[in-house]
């Protein structure tokens, strides 16, 4: 009799556990799509150098701004045309500066380039002029790095180029490899406040030597700008692009219908704006002038149809 009672209790307990697990899975299925709230009615794409730091110095107010986004669960991505660093490298750098960020917040032109190439050809191969951030992104996306007969010659930032490497890249392109630039920035700032030739300068050399024109998935290309926005799972009307450079951040954002915010702490001054045929949606002195309320007041309102459709699980 005791055995029967114990067995019955065991069966009942197991049934209860199965029911609890089933309910948990059902809840996950029904509520995996978040309803629009103040926290996810908009998202941000944020440039790094010149916006949250300048060289090795944090721009005042940047840490509080970013950490407040994290606290309020505002979706955002940092966008950088620097292909040298991996996501992990960038995360470690920002954490050291006081930002409470994670790997998924980082989106580089190296990642954009690797994802693009992975969609272009089955099992693509590449000869690489670049550093760890670029090679890691390519490997992660299944692109084999080779020295002979590559499908692509991929160029990123680097301090270890040799003339022999450039000569080899030139001949690979002349023999049929496609020339890919992670970005076309002519120069880039260094931590000590100096400037060195950027990826675009090296690519220009190869273009002149080969007669070929490079394709670049980096900012302001829609390849990078759109893919980053898709990671936020928001439409263009609820996406803000914050940057300091008119030719990449602001132009790229405007061309895709994002609301653009130019900060004057980096490469563009107020007087520079007169030189451009296009203008940012908003101009602020610094990221310190922005907060969540500022964006809530400027984001496109949700229509009743959107509220109803987004509130339903899909």
Where in the sequence are the language-model features?
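Asp-based, Mg2+/Mn2+-dependent phosphohydrolase catalytic module
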Residues: 6, 28-74, 83-107, 114-314
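Hydrophobic alpha-helical signal peptides and transmembrane signal-/tail-anchor segments
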Residues: 22-27
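Low-acidity, Ser/Thr- and Arg-rich intrinsically disordered low-complexity segments
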Residues: 6-8, 20
